[in-house]
Amino acid sequence: MSNVYDILKERGYIKQLTHEEEIRELLGKEKISFYIGFDPTADSLHVGHFLQMMVMAHMQKAGHRPIALVGGGTGMIGDPTGKTDMRKMMTKEQIEHNCNCFKKQLAKIIDFSEDKAIMVNNADWLLNLNYIEFLREIGVHFSVNKMLTAECFKSRLEKGLSFLEFNYMLMQGYDFLELNRKYNCVMELGGDDQWSNILAGVDLIRRKESKSAYGMTFTLLTNSEGKKMGKTESGALWLDPEKTSPYEFYQYWRNVADADVEKCLRLITFLPMDEVRRLSSLEGAEINEAKKVLAFEVTKLIHGEEEAQKAKIAAEALFGGNAKDLGNMPTAYIDKNDLNNLLVDLLVKCEIFPSKSEARRLIKQGGLYLNDEKVTDMNLVVTEEHVTEDGIMIRRGKKNFNRIVVE
C-alpha cells in the first residue's frame, strides 16, 4: 500500500511540516491518531472546511484514525487567526447545535462507525480548568516574546488584542496535549493559517510528556489569483443544502476559471491522478468537460449521487441545452471590451433593464441572479470569470432569463 504522505504530497495538500522525514516514515509504518480542529461559529461547514475533510478522508483510507475536535470551549473565546476584530462570543446552546450539524456533514466522507473516527468537544476539559493550576502546568511553557512574533497576533497588535484572545494559543496547545494523553494522538493537521498554534501544541507535548508530536499544515483553497475559493455573491459556499442548494453548489464548480480546474480536481475530488492529469490537459472548449466532471464529483461527495445528477441535468437544460433551447432565450451581444464594467451598466446597455435604478431596485429586493448566483453587490463588476461557455446568464425573479454573449 502506498504511503498516504506521498498521496498528500502528489495531490498538493502539504504546505508545512514540523519534521518531514519523521512524518513520512511514521505514516508509512504505523497507524496513528491525528486531529483537526473545527471552530463552531456557524451551523454548517463551508468549502474552506471541505479541503480539511478531504485530508481526513485520505488519511482514514490509509488506516489512520481521524479525531474531529470541535472547539466548544475555544469557541467561547474566538480564534484571532486572520481576524481584524474580536469575535462575538457564543452561547453553549448555539455551540452544541453547531457541533451536531458538523458531525452529520463530516460523516458524508468520514466513517465514524466502530471508532474508526471520533468527534470530541474541547469544552469537556477546558470548561472545568482550574486557572491557577493551568497557569502553573501550561502557562509556564509559553514565552510571551515568542507568542508576539506569531503571525496570528502580529496583525492584531495595532488594532488591539484582548487578553481573552491571547489565551487562544495556550488553549489550542492544551487541546493537543489532552488528545495525546487520552487518545494517543500524535499529529495535528490544519490550514496554513494555524501553523503558529500547531507549533505551540507540538512543543508543549515534547516538553510535558517527553514524547514526539508532529504538525502538518495544508494549502488553503485559493484560485489562480490567490483569493480564497468558496465565496459567492451571496456569501460563503456552505455544505448545508438549506444554505447553498446542490444546484448552486454544482454551478459554482462548473464555472470555475480554466486555470483553477487542475487544482480543484487534485484537492477536492478522489479521482485518480492519471485522470486528473488527463482532464487538466484538455484545452479550449474541451476544458468545459473537465469542469462538468469536477462539478459532478464534488457535488456527489457532499450531496450524494442523486442530487448531483439532478443538478447536472438542471444545469444542462438551462446552460448547456441544445441550440434551439438557447435560441429561444432573449440574447444580447457585447464586445469583450464591454467586460470589466458595472453589472447595472451592462444590463442597461443590453436593454435588459430600462434604467440603472430599476436594476438596482431588483438587486435590493434579492431578485437578480448572475449565472444563478444571487447578486447582492450594487457595484458588482462583470469580468471574464463570469463568462460561461454559453455566455453570461441573467435571471430576473424565478423564470425570466436573458443571455449575454461575448463576441
UniProtKB/Swiss-Prot annotation:
<comment type="function">
    <text>Catalyzes the attachment of tyrosine to tRNA(Tyr) in a two-step reaction: tyrosine is first activated by ATP to form Tyr-AMP and then transferred to the acceptor end of tRNA(Tyr).</text>
</comment>
<dbReference type="InterPro" id="IPR001412">
    <property type="entry name" value="aa-tRNA-synth_I_CS"/>
</dbReference>
<keyword id="KW-0030">Aminoacyl-tRNA synthetase</keyword>
<keyword id="KW-0067">ATP-binding</keyword>
<feature type="domain" description="S4 RNA-binding">
    <location>
        <begin position="341"/>
        <end position="405"/>
    </location>
</feature>
<keyword id="KW-0648">Protein biosynthesis</keyword>
<feature type="binding site">
    <location>
        <position position="35"/>
    </location>
    <ligand>
        <name>L-tyrosine</name>
    </ligand>
</feature>
<keyword id="KW-0963">Cytoplasm</keyword>
<dbReference type="InterPro" id="IPR036986">
    <property type="entry name" value="S4_RNA-bd_sf"/>
</dbReference>
<dbReference type="Pfam" id="PF00579">
    <property type="entry name" value="tRNA-synt_1b"/>
</dbReference>
<comment type="similarity">
    <text>Belongs to the class-I aminoacyl-tRNA synthetase family. TyrS type 1 subfamily.</text>
</comment>
<keyword id="KW-0694">RNA-binding</keyword>
<feature type="binding site">
    <location>
        <position position="172"/>
    </location>
    <ligand>
        <name>L-tyrosine</name>
    </ligand>
</feature>
<dbReference type="InterPro" id="IPR024107">
    <property type="entry name" value="Tyr-tRNA-ligase_bac_1"/>
</dbReference>
<dbReference type="InterPro" id="IPR014729">
    <property type="entry name" value="Rossmann-like_a/b/a_fold"/>
</dbReference>
<comment type="subunit">
    <text>Homodimer.</text>
</comment>
<protein>
    <recommendedName>
        <fullName>Tyrosine--tRNA ligase</fullName>
        <ecNumber>6.1.1.1</ecNumber>
    </recommendedName>
</protein>
<dbReference type="GO" id="GO:0003723">
    <property type="term" value="F:RNA binding"/>
</dbReference>
<keyword id="KW-0547">Nucleotide-binding</keyword>
<keyword id="KW-0436">Ligase</keyword>
<dbReference type="InterPro" id="IPR002307">
    <property type="entry name" value="Tyr-tRNA-ligase"/>
</dbReference>
<feature type="binding site">
    <location>
        <position position="168"/>
    </location>
    <ligand>
        <name>L-tyrosine</name>
    </ligand>
</feature>
<dbReference type="Pfam" id="PF22421">
    <property type="entry name" value="SYY_C-terminal"/>
</dbReference>
<feature type="short sequence motif" description="'KMSKS' region">
    <location>
        <begin position="228"/>
        <end position="232"/>
    </location>
</feature>
<dbReference type="GO" id="GO:0005524">
    <property type="term" value="F:ATP binding"/>
</dbReference>
<dbReference type="GO" id="GO:0005829">
    <property type="term" value="C:cytosol"/>
</dbReference>
<feature type="short sequence motif" description="'HIGH' region">
    <location>
        <begin position="40"/>
        <end position="49"/>
    </location>
</feature>
<feature type="binding site">
    <location>
        <position position="231"/>
    </location>
    <ligand>
        <name>ATP</name>
    </ligand>
</feature>
<dbReference type="InterPro" id="IPR024088">
    <property type="entry name" value="Tyr-tRNA-ligase_bac-type"/>
</dbReference>
<dbReference type="InterPro" id="IPR002305">
    <property type="entry name" value="aa-tRNA-synth_Ic"/>
</dbReference>
<dbReference type="InterPro" id="IPR054608">
    <property type="entry name" value="SYY-like_C"/>
</dbReference>
<dbReference type="GO" id="GO:0004831">
    <property type="term" value="F:tyrosine-tRNA ligase activity"/>
</dbReference>
<dbReference type="GO" id="GO:0006437">
    <property type="term" value="P:tyrosyl-tRNA aminoacylation"/>
</dbReference>
